[in-house]
Regions:
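Conserved, single-site charged/polar hotspot
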Residues: 1-321
């Protein structure tokens, strides 16, 4: 299966190379994506590099360092190509007649030019230029492993150490392993508190985990840490009588990460979180910190996706970069 997918990927690369128009434009890979726009509930065809622009602008703050923006551009492009049915991908899970959608909970966020104008206001021209430079500087670059685009995962802030994919998604990848991510303390949401009344938290937990038996009165003693991952995140907890995955607990209470502790505060319970997101793959805050220390985008990507290669998809074919 993998050999067939690899052959399909290489053939498509060669086809795109031969049919691409002779222009110096960065937005000219030749690949068109079928994109499902969740807000408009419609399908649109977009050139790959135009899609990368909108995905980068939606997924990472435009005022991040240029090298961090380049990392996100490569990540967005790799995700799109990996999913593209033209390259043997499976397309969008929720919209199988499309390559990718604009719902960040499913594929990747995306914003149109009109949305960016409304969001950025008077800073539109400056911020748009920053995004455009990152896309053009990485034009055609993908992250690959074994000759195929990798499964790209990223998040806002790891809290100082990324997570192994197997601990979150039960699917191990040699390039999605836990690595140190220093310098993230400057991220605005590095530490955060989320507070609930015990009654509210108990109701949410009972709805998600029927039969666990928690009540507002017993909540503080009914939640007990059972195990942690290698990076220090919550792997499993006991919620009343049930063992619950940290990721499921986080989703139930909309916590910022599985890197959390908790304490009772009268008739309330407070969760203290570190970092933001699932913690797997590229930490955007970590990329920003590494860029501030002088690392270029290739070094940053090699750190967060160890063992992968930067591979160029361009008019001359498919080759290591």
């Amino acid at each position: 299966m993998k050999q067939k997918q690899l052959l399909s990927f290489l053939v498509c690369i060669l086809m795109l190379s031969s049919c691409a128009a002779p222009t110096d434009s960065a937005h000219d890979s030749g690949l068109m994506l079928r994109v499902y726009f969740a807000d408009a509930e419609e399908i649109r065809l977009l050139p790959l590099e135009d899609y990368v622009f909108g995905a980068l602008a939606a997924e990472m703050p435009a005022n991040y360092a240029p090298e961090a923006l380049k990392c996100q551009a490569v990540a967005a492009r790799t995700r799109a190509v990996a999913q593209s049915r033209a390259f043997g991908g499976n397309g969008c899970v929720r919209h199988p007649d499309c390559d990718i959608c604009t719902d960040s909970a499913c594929c990747q966020a995306y914003q149109t030019d009109a949305q960016l104008k409304a969001r950025w206001g008077s800073e539109y021209a400056v911020l748009r230029a920053r995004i455009d430079r990152a896309v053009r500087a990485t034009d055609g670059l993908l992250l690959t492993s074994g000759g195929l685009p990798i499964e790209v995962l990223y998040h806002a802030c790891s809290g100082g150490k990324t997570e192994d994919a197997a601990a979150v998604f039960a699917s191990a990848k040699p390039y999605l392993v836990s690595v140190d991510s220093p310098g993230e303390e400057g991220y605005a949401g590095f530490r955060a508190d989320t507070s609930f009344s015990c009654e509210e938290a108990a109701a949410l937990l009972l709805r998600a985990f029927p039969g666990c038996g928690v009540t507002a009165d017993t909540l503080s003693s009914a939640i007990r840490l059972q195990s942690t991952t290698a990076s220090g995140r919550v792997a499993t907890l006991l919620v009343g009588s049930q063992t619950v995955r940290g990721a499921d607990f986080r989703k139930t209470l909309s916590l910022r990460s599985t890197y959390f502790t908790w304490e009772a505060d009268g008739d309330r319970i407070v969760f203290h979180t570190v970092g933001y997101g699932h913690g797997v793959g590229l930490s955007q805050a970590g990329a920003q910190a590494m860029a501030a220390d002088g690392a270029d985008f290739a070094e940053i990507l090699a750190h967060y996706y160890p063992g992968t290669q930067l591979t160029r998809m361009d008019k001359t074919g498919f080759s290591g970069s």
